[in-house]
């Protein structure tokens, strides 16, 4: 039994059900969908926005403090040029691109899953408070990086339509 759960994608679901009824192998289209969503998620990281275009919360002072060392300040403790450049160029969720590069998909004949295997990925996506997670150095705001934008939905629907035509 194949279960399809694509919230808000009624037309897309109808296309997928037509493919299933025709006995078609869905793994190629699910692979194309996964590839698209990985690329779209990478764009979310590069633009520091959620799939719906909402800007992510800015980095906190704790984030900046954790990335700065003695070579980033002058003798009075103020940021030097190197430290100021680090702070100015630091995007949320991007320190060394590890989380972004961990985004992958797994396609099968019954569906596609997009996500990360990084343990901290859920915390970065959903956020968390020090009250709920005492080991945190402070509250972490939600920065949604996974999900489909309206543009993604259009592309995913087109991928399915094209698969139906082939």
Residue positions per predicted region:
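Short, Lys/Arg-rich flexible segments
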Residues: 1-166
């Amino acid at each position: 039994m194949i279960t399809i759960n694509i919230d808000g994608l009624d037309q897309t679901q109808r296309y997928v059900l037509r493919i299933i009824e025709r006995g078609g192998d869905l793994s190629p289209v699910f692979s194309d969908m996964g590839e698209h969503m990985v690329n779209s998620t990478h764009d979310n990281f590069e633009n520091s926005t959620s799939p719906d275009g909402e800007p992510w919360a800015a980095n906190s002072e704790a984030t900046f403090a954790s990335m700065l060392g003695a070579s980033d300040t002058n003798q009075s403790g103020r940021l030097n040029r190197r430290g100021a450049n680090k702070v100015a160029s630091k995007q949320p969720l991007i320190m060394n691109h590890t989380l972004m590069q961990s985004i992958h998909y797994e396609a099968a004949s019954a569906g596609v899953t997009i996500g990360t295997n990084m343990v901290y990925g859920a915390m970065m996506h959903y956020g968390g408070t020090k009250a709920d997670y005492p080991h945190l150095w402070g509250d972490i705001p939600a920065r949604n990086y996974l999900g489909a934008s309206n543009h993604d939905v259009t592309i995913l629907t087109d991928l399915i339509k094209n698969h139906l035509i082939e």
